[in-house]
Amino acid sequence: MWFQLKIEHCPNDKIEEITEELEEYGALSITLTDKNDNPVLEPEPGTTPLWPEVIIHALFAQAEEAQYVREQLVAKTPSLHCSLEPLADKNWERAWMDDFRPQRFGNRLWVCPTWLPPPEPDAVNLMLDPGLAFGTGTHATTSLCLTWLEQADLKNKSVIDYGCGSGILSLAAIKLGAKHVYAVDIDNQALQATQNNAHANHITESQLSISSPEALQNPVHLIIANILLAPLISLKERFHQLLPSGAHLVTSGILEEQAPLLIDAYDSAFTHIATEYCEGWSLLVFTSK
C-alpha cells in the first residue's frame, strides 16, 4: 500500500519550492500534471511549469508520513488544497494502462501499448511501454511531432531526438525510414526508458544511439526537439552547429503564444518555414541558414 498526497490550488511561483520540500520530506515520487488535460509535465532543471492550474502528486510509503507533510505544507501555504489517497501497489504502478490505447498518427503510423495487439498489423506499428515518468503520445506536442514525422521523407536520413523521454519520437523516426537516430536526454530514466522501448521494437544499435547530449558530434539531416521554450532558446547555437545549411529543425513543447518568441530568437541562424497548432500548443519547422 502507498499513499498519494494530491496538492491543488498551488500558486505557480510556489511550485518549485513545494516540490523541493516534498523531496526533502522523502517523497518517493513527484508528478506534476495540468488540471485541464492531465499531460505528464517534464520540466527542464530550473524551469517553472507554464500552466495556470498545476496539480502536484507526491507518493509516500506511510500514511502518517504523508499526513505530516500535508499539515506542514498547509501551515506554510494556507491556500493549498491537499488530499490524501491510499493506492494499492498495482494501481500506483500501472494505473495509466487502462487509458493507454492504440493511437494513429497520419495515415500509417500507430503507437500501441506493448500489452495490446496492434489494430493494423501491416501498418507502421510502434510498440510503447512508457513507464510512469514519460508521455505516451496523447499530449498535443507529442502528437504534433508524430504527425509531422509520419508525413516527412526520412529515408536514409540521420536524426537527433533532443529530449527523447520515452524514445517515442526516436523509434517512430526509425520505423518511418530514418537510417540512424541519436536519442539524447539529460535524464537517465529517459535513456533507460528509450533503451527498453527500442528492445521491444527490435531496434538495433546500428539504428539508434542513446546518450546524453554532450556526446553529440556528427551533423545530421534533422533535429526534432519537444522541450520547453527556455532550453530551446538556449540551444540555438548548438542546434546550428549540428545542422548543415538547409537541414531541418522541428521544435515543439511551446505554447501557441510563445511561437513568435522562438521564431524571433532563431532568426539569425534558422529560417522559419511552417507552423502547426494543436490544443493551444505549437510545432515550428525551420531550416538552417
Curated annotation (Swiss-Prot):
Catalytic reaction annotation: L-lysyl-[protein] + 3 S-adenosyl-L-methionine = N(6),N(6),N(6)-trimethyl-L-lysyl-[protein] + 3 S-adenosyl-L-homocysteine + 3 H(+)
Keywords, alphabetical: Cytoplasm, Methyltransferase, S-adenosyl-L-methionine, Transferase
A single MF term (Gene Ontology): protein-lysine N-methyltransferase activity
Binding site for S-adenosyl-L-methionine: 142, 163, 185, 226
Keyword Transferase appears in the UniProt entry: yes
CDD domains: AdoMet_MTases
GO cellular component terms given for this protein: cytosol
Presence of keyword Transferase: yes
EC code: 2.1.1.-
Annotated S-S bridges: none
Primary site of residence: cytoplasm
SUPFAM superfamilies on file: S-adenosyl-L-methionine-dependent methyltransferases
BP GO annotations: methylation
Compartments, record wording: Cytoplasm
Job description of the protein: Methylates ribosomal protein L11.
UniProt record similarity statement: Belongs to the methyltransferase superfamily. PrmA family.
NCBIfam families in UniProt: prmA
This protein's name: Ribosomal protein L11 methyltransferase
Taxonomic lineage from the root: Bacteria, Pseudomonadati, Pseudomonadota, Gammaproteobacteria, Legionellales
